[in-house]
Amino acid sequence: MAAFTCTSSPPISLRSEMMIASSKTVSLSTRQMFSVGGLRTRVSLSSVSKNSRASRLRRGGIICEAQDTATGIPMVNDSTWESLVLKADEPVVVDFWAPWCGPCKMIDPIVNELAQQYTGKIKFFKLNTDDSPATPGKYGVRSIPTIMIFVKGEKKDTIIGAVPKTTLATSIDKFLQ
């Protein structure tokens, strides 16, 4: 997994907010996003006393988060599961995820890379566990992200959590013919 560093000093546009005049409490709702090596950095200010906010900004109130999950990998749901996954001629990798899941967002770029790398050899699908809860329940998905590999309709392997690309690739390679 790629390492990244977030800068701890606030952007110039926010430094001026540290010098807010006179009032004890200031109500601001500011959110700015900055790109840091493929990740988004969020600076967020809310209703706090000016001393507290200035102190937080001096400490570097910057939070790093992974990008929203939006991919070219086709979606599968409870109603399309059988036709797309169980009846597929080639091996299938299914990424069980949810939009609110931080680790799912972290592993998303890795799954996308692997989908491109294995194009024509293996099919990749994503299943949103919030929108389609029956299928994850049937396969015992209790934690996300969970990645399952199916061969001829049979579950062959399960990988739980945000794991490195090499771990996923090794698991996938076992089922290629």
From Swiss-Prot:
Cited Pfam families = Thioredoxin (PF00085)
- Top-level division of the source organism's lineage: Eukaryota
Q: Where is this site: Deprotonates C-terminal active site Cys?
A: 95
Compartments in which it is found:
Plastid, Chloroplast
Identify which residues the record assigns to the active site.
101, 104
Q: List the disulfide bonds.
A: 101-104
Effect the entry attributes to changing residue 99 to E: Reduces chloroplast FBPase activity
Cellular-component GO terms for this entry: chloroplast
Effect in UniProt of substituting residue 99 to K: Enhances chloroplast FBPase activity
Q: Which UniProt keywords apply?
A: Chloroplast, Disulfide bond, Electron transport, Plastid, Redox-active center, Transit peptide, Transport
Single Gene Ontology MF annotation: protein-disulfide reductase activity
Q: Where is the Thioredoxin domain?
A: 65-177
* Site residues, Contributes to redox potential value: 102-103
Q: Where is the transit peptide?
A: 1-64
Tell me the function of this protein. Answer: Participates in various redox reactions through the reversible oxidation of the active center dithiol to a disulfide. The M form is known to activate NADP-malate dehydrogenase.
- What family name appears in the similarity comment? Belongs to the thioredoxin family. Plant M-type subfamily.
Assembly and interactions?
Answer: Forms a complex with heterodimeric ferredoxin-thioredoxin reductase (FTR) and ferredoxin.
Protein name per its UniProtKB record: Thioredoxin M-type, chloroplastic
Species of origin reads Brassica napus
Read off the lineage from the record.
Answer: Eukaryota, Viridiplantae, Streptophyta, Embryophyta, Tracheophyta
